[in-house]
């Protein structure tokens, strides 16, 4: 039997999404001598990325200011126009932009494949010397004698369904690091272990979730408007008074990303997010876009919808939560890649400073404090009552109250009230 090998490094990052890749790049930008390892469970970077996406470039501008000129695929399709439809069963109305707070606008944003963006970011990371290992899931957290996180172990290979070892069995490798970043996305197994072990959710609201279903379509060129972004609310979820809605993003190469998000706190046990998505696609306004087209890819993923109230403690001895592992999705904007990237950058800066100061396996409390005072905190506070308002008061009244709350926070009017999740 092969013995388990051990690999030392300065920082190991679990997850090759926007947060993990941004953290890796930022670490090497600060100190090129740092040994940074990034583990991705997918067969390649981007294999498990399923966002639409419309990307706010704020964090990308900070991380790689010349990304537009460096061949980043996201630069191909800037948002050209933005629509918000309120659907009935057979019709639609356009919600005027003036009714929505400025943070809901998409001018200056870009639409494209987040998986392609991650693949490009991985290339930038590797060029800086980051060791990127796709196909290596982190299966176990390693702890030191004092209980601090000291790294992770990768999954054993060649294990039969009954747990026995096949002839080609190979044990996983111990990746031992001064600091470990968990960038697993929503509901990652190791992240849940860290939350429980270090009681990270003691001072926040419970996280709540939605289910996002997405398809990629090749559509008739006559129906394609590159850069057009459409978000919808109302039917069909209005029939069950459930929070959620649809999106249609016209991307490059004659494709649209179409999807549907359903909050998982729906009251009617017969609601099926998948069936609601099928009904959505048959709405006359949506079907007209897809007519003559062909679905080429599809998938689904969990989405953190708890917002600011549900952000846990982010740092603990030897480790930190970044990206959707912590939950930085701006639910009304349906955006989280920019906040995920910024969280990774802030964690990287805190870890680099700690290592430069001779520390290891300590709690990166500066990361937690700096994130809460950053533009991530400012942005999420503006929308923190949106999901709770709809969950408590229903789709129609809740949406109105959420809009009023966002406007009041934007204009700094009234007392800040933080609603709790049910």
What do the PLM-derived regions correspond to, one by one?
Residues 10-37:
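N-terminal Rossmann-like FAD-binding beta1-loop-alpha1 element of flavoenzymes
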Residues 19, 44, 187:
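Conserved Rossmann-like nucleotide-cofactor binding loop
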Residues 115, 119, 124-288, 346:
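Predominantly flavin-linked oxidoreductase catalytic cores and closely associated redox partners
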Residues 300-331:
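FAD-binding beta-loop-beta segment adjacent to the flavin cofactor pocket
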Residues 327-333, 345, 349-395:
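Active-site-proximal substrate-binding core of FAD-dependent oxidoreductases
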Residues 390-422:
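C-terminal auxiliary extensions adjacent to catalytic cores
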């Amino acid at each position: 039997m092969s013995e388990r090998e051990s690999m030392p490094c300065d920082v190991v990052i679990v997850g090759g999404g926007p947060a993990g890749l941004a953290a890796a790049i930022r670490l090497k930008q600060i100190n090129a001598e740092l040994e940074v390892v990034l583990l991705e469970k997918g067969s390649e970077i981007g294999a498990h990325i399923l966002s639409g996406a419309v990307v706010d470039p704020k964090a990308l501008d900070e991380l790689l200011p010349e990304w537009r000129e460096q061949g980043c695929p996201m630069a191909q399709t800037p948002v050209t126009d933005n629509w918000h439809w309120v659907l009935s069963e057979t019709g639609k109305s356009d919600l005027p932009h003036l009714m929505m707070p400025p943070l809901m606008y998409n001018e200056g944003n870009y639409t494209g494949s987040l998986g392609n963006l991650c693949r490009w970011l991985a290339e930038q990371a590797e060029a800086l010397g980051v060791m990127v290992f796709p196909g290596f899931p982190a299966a176990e957290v390693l702890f030191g004698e004092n209980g601090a996180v000291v790294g992770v172990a990768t999954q054993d290979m060649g294990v039969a369904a009954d747990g026995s070892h096949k002839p080609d069995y190979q044990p996983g490798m111990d990746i031992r690091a001064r600091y470990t970043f968990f960038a697993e996305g929503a509901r990652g197994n190791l992240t849940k272990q860290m939350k429980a072990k270090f009681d990270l959710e003691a001072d926040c609201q419970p996280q709540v979730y939605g289910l996002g279903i997405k398809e990629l379509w090749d559509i008739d060129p006559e129906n394609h408007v590159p850069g057009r972004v459409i978000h919808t609310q109302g039917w069909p979820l209005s029939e069950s008074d459930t929070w959620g809605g649809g999106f249609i993003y016209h991307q490059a190469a004659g494709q649209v990303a179409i999807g549907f998000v359903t909050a998982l706190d729906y009251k009617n046990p017969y609601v099926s997010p998948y069936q609601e998505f099928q009904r959505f696609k048959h709405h006359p306004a949506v079907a007209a876009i897809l007519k003559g087209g062909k679905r080429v890819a599809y998938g689904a993923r969990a989405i953190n919808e708890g917002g600011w109230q549900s952000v846990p403690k982010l740092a603990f001895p030897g480790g930190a939560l970044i990206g959707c592992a912590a939950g930085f999705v701006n639910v009304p904007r349906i955006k989280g890649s920019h906040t995920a990237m910024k969280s990774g950058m802030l964690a990287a800066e805190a870890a680099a400073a700690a290592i430069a100061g001779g520390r290891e396996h300590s709690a990166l409390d500066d990361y937690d404090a700096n994130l809460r005072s950053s533009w991530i905190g400012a942005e999420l506070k503006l929308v923190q009552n949106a999901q709770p308002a709809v969950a408590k008061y229903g789709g129609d009244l809740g949406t109105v109250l959420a809009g009023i709350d966002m406007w009041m926070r934007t204009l700094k009017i009234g007392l800040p009230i933080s609603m709790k999740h049910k």
